[in-house]
Amino acid sequence: MSPRHRARARRSVVCAAVAAAALVTGSVAAGAYSLGRSPDAASRAVSSAPPSESPSRTPEAAEVTVDLDTVLAAAVEPVVARSGASLSVAVLDTKSGESAVYGEKTYDTASIVKVDILAALLLAAQDAGRSLTAEEKTQAAAMIRLSDNTAATALWQTIGGARGLDAANERLGLTETAGAGAWGLTQTTARDQLALLQAVFGTNSVLSEASRTYLQTLMEQISTDQDWGVSAAGSGWALKNGWMPRTATGLWDVNSIGRVSVDGRVCLVAVLSDGHATKEAGIALVEAAARKAVSSL
């Protein structure tokens, strides 16, 4: 073999080895990656290739898939484990369409249900071909911006309570949410709250553009003493939080849902949690989980 042919053969083997090493490293480091060829098989293919193999032949391209739920769990679980509380989070990148969910537990909504109540009211108004009344607008603004409970109770009655909420949610795409005798005890999941956010902030929604814009605007005007939660994960936020101590245990439910902008991306995030010793501890955990969720995508 001429010197030029020997040099060409050495380059072929080195390139193949580097490609195989990259596959092995990616598999070990990420854990959540599934490769078309196992790392061992790739290593054997390179090490067994004869030196005289033609330079034009390269290892087959490996198909790589990522389980984003697994990636999200790896990011969030250490934070939750240290807290002693229970938490579920769902996140969606609106541009790529990629989403992930951690946790399947059902939680009390507390005041995040106020977004759902207003969505149900707007849907009913659309059906009737009318705008909200002046009184309804006043109540809606107080309910979302200030988290006013009296306004929420009034609008809860207007939409028909739990039955009216459930009927609206069937149309909004929520399948894991059930209204209760008291609006704050409505049961939901992070996955379903993400579906609600898609109905509010997406374009493929039974809510009209005018209804969506109205709800979004109120969520962008949250009182400054309530602008915590998913807003910690980015800027340009619109959100609604919920917090409630449970009488039976003295422990807190702390939830946050909304939209944030991060590094040019727009994400929808829902974080639900319970079992906190204090409201402040719950807020800290919710914000940490929101940041982890957005960065995991």
Regions found by a protein language model. Give the residues of each.
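Penicillin-recognizing serine hydrolase domain
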Residues: 2-4, 8-27, 31-51, 67-87, ...
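Acidic/histidine-rich, surface-exposed loop or edge segments in extracytoplasmic proteins
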Residues: 47-62, 98-102, 118-121, 145-148
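Hydrophobic alpha-helical segments that drive targeting, anchoring, or assembly
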Residues: 91, 101-118, 136, 154
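Active-site SXXK
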Residues: 97, 106-130, 143, 269
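Conserved catalytic neighborhood of penicillin-recognizing serine enzymes
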Residues: 125-178
